[in-house]
Swiss-Prot record:
This is Colanic acid capsular biosynthesis activation protein B. Keywords: Capsule biogenesis/degradation, Transcription, Transcription regulation. The lineage of its organism: Bacteria, Pseudomonadati, Pseudomonadota, Gammaproteobacteria, Enterobacterales.
């Protein structure tokens, strides 16, 4: 979709998900809690996705 530099093993969907969480709408604030760090590692983005999934699926 678009080219990135410095994010090995990170898919375009993960990047779009992280970018979508920055949109200042009530829905995005409810579903995404994005820790603002200077450099993302693969583990941090996986942790962000897990946090989103945990909120979307009650009982986890």
């Amino acid at each position: 979709m678009f080219q990135r530099i410095g994010f090995p093993g990170v898919t375009n969907f993960q990047v779009l998900l992280a970018l979508a969480s920055l949109i200042p709408t009530p829905a995005s604030r409810d579903f995404f809690r994005l820790p603002l760090t200077v450099g993302f590692t693969g583990a941090e983005i996986v942790n962000i996705e897990f946090e989103c999934l945990r909120q979307l699926t009650p009982g986890m």
